UniProtKB/Swiss-Prot annotation:
CDD domains: DSRM_RED2_rpt1 (cd19896). Lacks editing activity. It prevents the binding of other ADAR enzymes to targets in vitro, and decreases the efficiency of these enzymes. Capable of binding to dsRNA but also to ssRNA. This is Double-stranded RNA-specific editase B2. InterPro entries: A_deamin, ADAR3_DSRM_1, dsRBD_dom. The lineage of its organism: Eukaryota, Metazoa, Chordata, Craniata, Vertebrata. One of its GO terms (cellular component) is nucleus. The gene is Adarb2. Residues 1-35, 50-104 are annotated as: Disordered. Its EC number is 3.5.-.-. It comes from Mus musculus. Residues 20-34 have a biased composition (Basic residues).
Length: 745
């Protein structure tokens, strides 16, 4: 029994000794860990990677509550340095010192080879976009823009203005739309997960109004300002001494972010790679970044034109000038914006990114500027250096004809000015007046005059005249344009209607100085005000006006220029009468002098008719190339003149129309009125009746001649139904009595 007890005590003593030894081992290990805990906690986010091979004598694998640190240290190069009182870790004492690794052959400098900040688990909980935006920009006003869609599935649009730009979000509820608008605003200038981290990164935890629109942070005491190139590091040009005050202050904040700093100096772009022969199929964004690094692209709008089809507008500011692009994706929109900047500033055209109907809807900037200059110079010439009384105008429009995109052979064929419509009391049932005297509409009527004259030229008995005509005869009958004949419309300001009212901003030299006009009923059809300026959305389902109602004082309604130009992109410029003779004629490009927004202009001119469906042969949904001008025409202050001027190539002088009466100042009918065109058409019809497909009996009335263009009329009805189906309103027509007059030779 005693032996058993003795052996039990012996084994118990051995076990006790082993336990004590194990406890002492754990205690020593714990003390050793405590000694390096300060250094571990401080250096946990930073990982030092030597550029060369070093002899590693010791390696500790430590773990904290949120991050694992693996550290390769050269013990022979470790020095000690007291840790500032503010940098003590939890549970540590002031006597603890931290170790500072040095790189051999670098003069004892602390090398920043790759600095990584890791977001710890105890960082601030991410906040939603509304809260973040409020912290960065307090006092913002969100406004309800529109509500579309059916009652059971509404779509709300909410807008917010930040730094002079307006961001619009859409959603099934106002709250989601508001959140989406805030997200888009944040994406334009915040580069961090939440607002608090953004402030810490920029060196300020108290000022919520820091401007993040600049990529190059030049604010005092900010993150990137502390890292300056050092000329002392001759052996290691890529290494820079770290400012210990910056590191300690970053540690004291207790918020560690993830960021990797580029250690190499910014390389200058290789100009040889930018030679025209070396560009090849390179992306314009990449090429522009090599010329001007650090550019930021801002998403100005994101709209859903139809289910699962979105349209984006991106803008970039280069050398004080703003360029924008639109596309089905942000990548395509950025590419267009970069391409526009390359063309305007560096005269670089990338072969793989030349604007075309299939790839881009942007016109080369230099070509657009040339068209603008041709129109303004011609107008100056016709008004004797703008000294004529008829030189005064609010809107100037013109159409330029080119062969391809060769500006050397460009020719101004029509010019016009004006901003008013006739008064209802002056409407004519004989086609003796011009109802709409807005510059764009008068330019199109002058273009009809040009087409009639070209048809007559083709029928001339002189042998050389048919070759000078822009038309060639088709085997199956009728005529079409010669190959490579293009027409370009220039308007000094954005067309009245949705293109002007709902344009997000006017491009200026600074994105932050852009102005925004409230966008309500965006995309809706709009009508002009009788004898005045401006437009209003269409009201009610009624699509026909009555003759007697207008004579008794009812307002005469005329569709806006934006909507009429949009219809030309489906029906063509030639109208119903000329469809008896020629194929539809479309604009190749539209150049706007001021108050324009390329993305919105494309949306209202082409994208609103996405649901029009299949069109008959020779008709198409035209998508003209769009562009602004480098130097917009100055705004014309004061009241608009009550006259409209027009000119057609071959004419000696301007014709002046009284915009209130729709007739010339002398009281006679204009060369652009319906009566003149009807007589011209009747003469041509008599000569061409054997050369064109027959459509029945020869019409005797103007309205019968128009209705006789059956294909044109069916496409017209198809267009109006597409507007209604899209919820954009009903096209308002003039009283039918104004077309019920006899054709005369």
């Amino acid at each position: 029994m005693a032996s058993v007890l003795g052996s039990g005590r012996g084994s118990g003593g051995l076990s006790s000794q082993l336990k004590c030894k194990s406890k002492r081992r754990r205690r020593r290990r714990s003390k050793r860990k405590d000694k390096v805990s300060i250094l571990s906690t401080f250096l946990a986010p930073f990982k030092y990677l030597s550029p060369g091979t070093t002899n590693t004598e010791d390696e500790d694998n430590l773990s904290t509550s949120s991050a694992e640190v693996k550290e390769n240290r050269n013990v022979s190069n470790l020095g000690t340095r007291p840790l500032p009182p503010g940098d003590w870790a939890r549970g540590s004492t002031p006597s603890v010192k931290r170790k500072r690794p040095l790189e051999e052959g670098n003069g004892g400098h602390f090398c920043k080879l790759q600095l990584i900040w890791k977001k710890l688990s105890w960082s601030v909980t991410p906040k939603n976009a509304l809260v973040q935006l409020h912290e960065l920009k307090p006092g913002l006003q969100y406004r309800m823009v529109s509500q579309t869609g059916p009652v059971h599935a509404p779509v709300f649009a909410v807008a917010v203005e930040v730094n002079g730009l307006t961001f619009e979000g859409t959603g099934p509820t106002k709250k989601k739309a508001k959140m989406r608008a805030a997200e888009m605003a944040l994406k334009s200038f915040v580069q961090f997960p939440n607002a608090f981290q953004a402030h810490l990164a920029m060196g300020s935890s108290t000022s919520p109004c820091t401007d993040f629109t600049s990529d190059q942070a030049d604010f005092p005491d900010t993150l990137f300002k502390e890292f300056e190139p050092s000329s002392k590091n001759e052996d290691f040009p890529g290494c820079h001494p770290v400012d210990t005050e910056f590191l300690s202050s970053a540690y004291r904040r207790g918020r560690l972010l993830y960021h990797t700093l580029d250690l190499m100096g910014q390389a200058l772009p290789d100009r040889s790679r930018l030679a025209p022969g070396a560009l090849g199929e390179r992306n314009p964004v990449v090429v522009l970044n090599e010329l001007r690094s650090g550019l930021r692209y801002v998403c100005l709008s994101e709209t859903a034109e139809k289910p699962r089809v979105k349209s984006f507008v991106m803008a970039v500011c280069v050398d004080g000038r703003t360029f924008e692009g639109s596309g089905r994706s942000k990548k395509l929109a950025k590419g267009q914006a970069a391409q526009a900047a390359l063309q305007a500033l560096f005269d670089i055209r990338l072969p793989g990114h030349i604007p075309s109907r299939s790839k881009s809807n942007l016109l080369p900037q230099d070509f657009a500027d040339s068209v603008s200059q041709l129109v303004t110079q011609k107008f100056r010439e016709l008004t004797v250096g703008l000294t004529s009384v008829y030189a005064r105008h609010k809107t100037l429009a013109g159409i330029v004809m080119t062969k391809g995109l060769d500006t050397k052979q460009a020719q101004v064929i029509v010019l016009s000015s004006g901003t008013k419509c006739i008064s209802g009391e002056h409407i004519s049932d004989q086609g003796l007046v011009v109802n709409d005297c807005h510059a764009e509409i008068v330019a199109r009527r002058a273009f009809l005059h040009f087409l009639y004259s070209q048809l007559e030229l083709h029928l001339s008995k002189h042998q050389e005249d048919p070759e000078r005509s822009i038309f060639i005869r088709l085997k199956e009958g009728g005529y079409r344009l010669r190959e490579n004949i293009l027409f370009h419309l220039y308007v000094s300001t954005s067309p009245c209607g949705d293109a002007r009212v709902n344009s997000p901003y006017e491009i200026t030299t600074d994105l932050n100085s852009s102005k925004h006009i409230v966008r309500k009923f965006r995309g809706h059809l709009r009508t002009k005000i009788e004898s005045g300026e401006g437009t209003v959305p269409v009201r009610g389902p009624s699509a026909v006006q009555t003759w007697d109602g207008i004579l008794l004082g009812e307002q005469l309604i005329t569709m806006s220029c934006t909507d009429k130009i949009a219809s030309w992109n489906v029906l063509g410029l030639q109208g119903a009468l000329l469809c008896h003779f020629i194929e539809p004629v479309y604009l190749h490009s539209i150049i706007v002098g001021s108050l324009h927004h390329t993305g919105h202009l494309a949306r209202v001119m082409s994208h609103r008719m996405e649901g029009i469906g299949q069109l008959p042969a020779s008709y198409r949904q035209n998508r003209p190339l769009l562009s602004g001008v480098s130097h917009a025409e100055a705004r014309q202050p004061g009241k608009s003149p009550h006259f409209s001027a027009n000119w057609v190539v071959g004419s000696a002088d301007l014709e002046i129309i009284n915009a209130t009466t729709g007739k010339r100042s002398c009281g006679g009918s204009s060369r652009l009125c319906k009566h003149v065109f009807s007589a011209w058409w009747a003469r041509l019809h008599g000569r061409l009746s054997t050369r064109i497909p027959s459509h029945g009996d020869t019409p005797s009335m103007y309205c019968e001649a128009k209705q006789g263009a059956h294909t044109y009329q069916s496409v017209k009805q198809q267009l109006f139904k597409a507007f209604q189906k899209a919820g954009l309103g009903t096209w308002v027509r003039k009283p039918p009595e104004q077309d019920q007059f006899l054709l005369s030779l």
